[in-house]
Amino acid sequence: MPIITLPDGSQRQFDNPVSVLEVAQSIGSGLAKATIAGRVNGERRDASDMISEDANLEIITAKDEDGLEIIRHSTAHLLGHAIKQLFPNVKMAIGPTIDNGFYYDIDLDRSLTQEDIDTLEKRMLELAKTNYDVIKKRVSWQEARDTFESRAEPYKIAILDENIAKDDQPALYHHEEYIDMCRGPHVPNMRFCHHFKLMKVAGAYWRGNSDNKMLQRIYGTAWADKKQLADYLHRLEEAAKRDHRKIGKALDLYHMQEEAPGMVFWHNDGWTIFRELETFVRTKLKEYDYQEVKGPFMMDRVLWERTGHWQNYADLMFTTQSENREYAIKPMNCPGHVQIFNQGLKSYRDLPIRMAEFGSCHRNEPSGSLHGLMRVRGFTQDDAHIFCTEDQIESEVTSCIKMVYDIYSTFGFTDIFVKLSTRPEKRIGEDVMWDRAEQGLANALKHNGLEYEIQEGEGAFYGPKIEFALRDCLDREWQCGTIQLDFALPGRLDATYVAEDNARRTPVMIHRAILGSIERFIGIITEEYAGFFPTWLAPIQAVVMNITDSQADYVQKVVKQFSEAGLRVKADIRNEKVGFKIREHTLRRVPYMLVCGDKEIVENKIAVRTRKGTDLGTFSVEEFVEILKQQVRKRELTLLGE
């Protein structure tokens, strides 16, 4: 006689074992119809699963995040159902969920075309609209293997042989004649899987191992209703328009080429944005009492062995040799900062020491993972390391948190997600050290009133970390900032200070980055602003243009006044119609167009319009110089008149 406790604390008693769906039916027909699955004592279970003992139960519907994830997983099975009907000889591999959707890896004897994808999507919809029930059956390991052997599914057999114990009872999900194997849970009926779209096909190695066969990976997205799907597809369209690679080319910001994969060639305008970001961060370094340093580009392998990087990070490090010595090009700045700390005796009175660097780092990322500015091999980190005592940890982490939010708000990012990443399987240091480090970061977050999500096993090999993810205008998350606590590296590199009792102690090291990779951050803000950079970041802040040749000298005089005020302004005195010039510079996203005609010369003024087409009227040159200077000084996000 199980007693089921619901989230509101109410209880229901049943005479016999009861399924999740039956509990929902006892509450109401509306809830039963909406039931996708349940959470029994915190564990996700299928709607058909029986509950035989007292338990806490939450009903999962399409309104829940878990419900949407289950819909996506079941839509992957729907894809399997459809493709098996269209291509009976296809071999099915794996079909997990991913952010906003799912994929299925398949082994087919020919490449899928866009026409195939369209046909496949149509068949999926036809099947889903029959609203068939999904039947779950627990079977023995051998029965599952026999099932997939009879269906000639070698990848499913491999999963059973390599990943599932022989005394286990795998779950087989029956989608009419199609059978798939999965942990589940899945939707009880395909009426939940009507809103999806297949997105693309890519190559993927079985098990992610390049020694294995290349499979075809079909990506799709699935949502709970028609509006969610339409909104998502609209966001994708908008993201395509905002693609930093397209905008970077259109605005002549940078380029990349095959001879230097993952390395950026910054053009003048892109480098202007880069330097403005550095200048801004430097003002904050001064405000938060950091010293700026510069470490060497590469160091001897021996040092990287002492730090643990060689044992834990070698695959991502570029190396070179000279005079029978092996060097590694630095993938991060921390070992160099410890070397600077070690020069000269340090006292507890000197701590904390906050050491910052715009460090040029290189990581040998797989070529297939490179993506514009978002994933590169050569990048610049706005990196800092704080050497402090254990008693100073919380106050220093709190200061870092304040600095993170201070900087992000300047760019208009206020929706920030905080995650605490804990010890990974591959790590250095004792568990007691990790306990202290993880607790120290958790305490700082709690004392600052920040909600956070724990990411088990996602920390760096030398310490746990706080991650800050920005949510942009398209509802995407970008992980940028990190604060990492490190009790190990200073000791490995013999960093010490003289404590109050005259004993030599090892300092705690806090790693922190806010923008992260400056290259990547430029990619993020390029897409956030769609290339319409605020005045302080815009490579060209205003263009002064004439109407006829008679105003050319006046234009040059005006440009000189703006330039002398430290503003980035250029002249356009080409023999072109003023409307043509305005259109051209509008496409270049220049914030302000300053037009000079005969009337403006007489009045010693300029006519001002914005890149959005707003006519701001006329201003004296001195007046508008001050307006632009103020916009730059305050780092305002909007233009005048917006």
From Swiss-Prot:
Binding site for Zn(2+): C334, H385, H511
GO CC annotation terms, alphabetical: cytosol
Co-factor binding comment: Binds 1 zinc ion per subunit.
EC class: ligase
Keywords: Aminoacyl-tRNA synthetase, ATP-binding, Cytoplasm, Ligase, Metal-binding, Nucleotide-binding, Protein biosynthesis, RNA-binding, tRNA-binding, Zinc
Keyword hit for tRNA-binding: yes
Cofactor: Zn(2+)
Family matches, as InterPro entries: aa-tRNA-synt_IIb, aa-tRNA-synth_II, aa-tRNA-synth_II/BPL/LPL, Anticodon-bd, Anticodon-bd_dom_sf, Beta-grasp_dom_sf, TGS, TGS-like
Any one GO molecular function term: threonine-tRNA ligase activity
Localisation per UniProt entry: Cytoplasm
Protein biosynthesis in keyword set: yes
Location of the TGS domain: 1-61
Biological process, per Gene Ontology: threonyl-tRNA aminoacylation
EC number: 6.1.1.3
Catalytic as annotated region, ranges: 243-534
Listed Pfam families: HGTP_anticodon, TGS, tRNA-synt_2b, tRNA_SAD
SMART domains: tRNA_SAD
SUPFAM superfamilies, per database record: Class II aaRS ABD-related, Class II aaRS and biotin synthetases, TGS-like, ThrRS/AlaRS common domain
Catalytic activities: tRNA(Thr) + L-threonine + ATP = L-threonyl-tRNA(Thr) + AMP + diphosphate + H(+)
Family recorded in the similarity comment: Belongs to the class-II aminoacyl-tRNA synthetase family.
Subunit structure: Homodimer.
Role this protein plays: Catalyzes the attachment of threonine to tRNA(Thr) in a two-step reaction: L-threonine is first activated by ATP to form Thr-AMP and then transferred to the acceptor end of tRNA(Thr). Also edits incorrectly charged L-seryl-tRNA(Thr).
NCBIfam families referenced in this protein's UniProt entry, alphabetically: thrS
Stated name of the protein: Threonine--tRNA ligase
Organism: Histophilus somni (strain 129Pt) (Haemophilus somnus)
